[in-house]
Amino acid sequence: MNIIDHFEQENIAKLTANKQIPDFKAGDTVKVTVKVLDRSIEKDGKEKLTERFQAYEGLVIAKRNRGITSSFLVRKISHGEGVERRFMTYSPIVHSINVVKYGVVRRAKLYYLRNRSGKSARIKERHIHIAKTKTVKA
């Protein structure tokens, strides 16, 4: 491992120390919570910055794994229009990533969904079976 890879691994460890990034891929529906700064002007003319969280839920149509510059592209339909937004995976702006549904697809990049709408843009759902553990009372 060269110096740059080692430096990137250290930075990734620092950025993910207080948040957990789930394992997801193209075809999964995710809910990304992002920190947003709102700027407002008070009555006395001073500017006030407030931080709030904004959720963005949509289908992952592409994922790019490149160390600290990894990113993923999320597409959703808002008011009848397709909206795509790229998120940097390890960005401090991204507060949390939650997987809502797991999808079954045969491609790594789902750019063909841009040309589809309605039923033809649906993705089959992949069901995850979690093994239940039995507790034994002594």
From Swiss-Prot:
Domain of life per record: Bacteria
This protein's GO CC annotations: cytosolic large ribosomal subunit
One Gene Ontology term from the biological process aspect of the record: translation
Any GO molecular function: structural constituent of ribosome
Keywords, alphabetical: Ribonucleoprotein, Ribosomal protein
InterPro entries from the UniProt entry: Ribosomal_bL19, Ribosomal_bL19_CS, Ribosomal_bL19_sf, Translation_prot_SH3-like_sf
Function, in words: This protein is located at the 30S-50S ribosomal subunit interface and may play a role in the structure and function of the aminoacyl-tRNA binding site.
Family affiliation: Belongs to the bacterial ribosomal protein bL19 family.
Protein name: Large ribosomal subunit protein bL19
